[in-house]
Amino acid sequence: MKSFACNVKVNAIEYFHIKLNANEEIKVMKQKLRNLSAPANIIFAILAVFIFIALLQWSGKFLGLIPGMEKADDYLLQAIVETVVLVIFLGITYLFGLWDIFKENAAGWTRSLYTGGFFIVYCLYAVVSGIYLCFLGEHGDVKAFYNIIFFFIAVCLVGLVEELVFRGVVFNLLLRAFPKTKGGITGAVVLGGVLFGLMHFSNMGAGVKFSSCLIQVISAGLMGVLFCMIYASTRNFWMLAIFHTVVDMGGLLSSGIFEGGGVADRINEFSAMNCIAFVVLGIPMFVMLRKSRRIRLEMLYNNVTIIDDEREGAKLAVVSLVLGICSIIFSFFGYLMGLGIVGMLASKMSKRAKQYNNAIATAGMITSIIGFVLSVICTIGMMVLFASGIYDRLVNMTM
């Protein structure tokens, strides 16, 4: 009995010794991965993209070998694949010492949302358009409730996983590689966006034709540059994950609710008309890359304290008022309800920088609230018209 107890004690000591050594090895590996040279960081960033694509492709093929899975809903399969990728890249994030991305928020939520204001407008435009398309387009039968749930889960996972891979891992590795200057940070931003865009060529393996895929690649590249610039300015991972999810959800809403089309079918509908997205995304991209914004980034990454003065507060007040007025003017169909939200954010920031004698910011807040409320009312009104059939009757009367 005494011998047995001694053996148990020895085995326990050996187990904890092995575990301790394993922990030490992981610490050493993490330290090495944190201190990679600039070329090595770039190589690992590009390698992460290939790992991501390979995981998507091979996980999907593996699921196809499981009996019965070939009949499963496309979005269920995508949710499973994205979960696998998420788990693996969480491990990669930990090994490269990037775990803090989930806690960072350098600018605070108000400034973060204002900095990403374009995507507030774009996200709500995508959602409103998607809802209207569900009412107006020709669709198959409504999917089973559980398949609609799979759609929402899959889209949420896609947004989360792609932001984890391309902003959380790839872009942060590029930031480590490039110098913390205006040019260096801009280089990381542009390369991060380009890699995000090129990744979408992998959709050709899912049946997307080249012309449609090329439009998606260019649009995604421009969007990737915007996402990288916003992330560099705010260090707010969760905000971008939400933006990404909402944009995808708006664009794919009809395919998630109705039978008869998947993601590839939706992308194959892209035509020359979709090239307008290049302008819609290109203008805010160049605005975000302006010199003053890049100077602010250089200060941020060199630990220089940035404080908005009264002059900045006055500018924000004017922006708020302009956005508020525009939100009222364009409130009719509800597409641009995001203008009112961004106007409210600008007004709030203006009042922080200029607390007194700031009537313009107050006017901006009031007009922005009015514009947002009108947009919501108009959107609900349009949905009622579509659902009741009144809209169709009005169209038929004019024909």
Model-predicted segments: where are they?
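Low-complexity, intrinsically disordered extramembrane tails and loops of integral membrane proteins
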Residues: 1-29, 299-314, 399
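N-terminal membrane topogenic signal
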Residues: 29-46
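Alpha-helical transmembrane segments in multi-pass membrane proteins
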Residues: 42-96, 109-123, 145, 149-150, ...
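Aromatic-anchored segments of alpha-helical transmembrane domains
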Residues: 50-57, 123-129, 193-202, 245-256, ...
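Functionally important transmembrane alpha-helices
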Residues: 54, 212-269
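Membrane-interface helix/loop boundary segments of multi-pass membrane proteins
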Residues: 164-191, 232-236
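C-terminal membrane module of polytopic membrane proteins
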Residues: 245-305
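Membrane-embedded alpha-helical segments of small multi-pass membrane proteins
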Residues: 315-352, 359-388
